[in-house]
């Protein structure tokens, strides 16, 4: 059986919190920001948790995370 390998793109985008939830960054905050309102950009700040429907695919991409 081959080694289980972590997806490099996933380990750069996700962090596992101590409680077992996964933290991710918000999308739509990199470029073309002039046409977005200040309120919209403010709501995109910070990190949010990955939704439980996506946790299965995250667990496959991060096999060593113990999800």
Curated annotation (Swiss-Prot):
Transmembrane portions of the chain: none
Biased composition (Basic residues): 1-16
GO molecular function annotation: structural constituent of ribosome
GO cellular component, one term: cytosolic large ribosomal subunit
Region span, Disordered: 1-24
Keywords assigned by UniProt, alphabetized: Ribonucleoprotein, Ribosomal protein
InterPro entries xref list: Ribosomal_bL35 (IPR001706), Ribosomal_bL35-like (IPR021137), Ribosomal_bL35_CS (IPR018265), Ribosomal_bL35_sf (IPR037229)
Classification via Pfam families: Ribosomal_L35p
GO biological process: translation
Family membership: Belongs to the bacterial ribosomal protein bL35 family.
PANTHER family (UniProt xref): 54S RIBOSOMAL PROTEIN BL35M, LARGE RIBOSOMAL SUBUNIT PROTEIN BL35M
Protein name, UniProt field: Large ribosomal subunit protein bL35
């Amino acid at each position: 059986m081959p080694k289980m390998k972590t997806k490099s793109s996933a380990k750069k985008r996700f962090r596992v919190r101590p409680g077992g939830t996964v933290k991710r960054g918000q999308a739509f905050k990199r470029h073309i920001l002039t046409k977005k309102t200040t309120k919209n950009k403010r709501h995109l700040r910070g990190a949010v948790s990955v939704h439980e429907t996506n946790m299965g695919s995250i667990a496959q991409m991060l096999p060593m995370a113990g999800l």
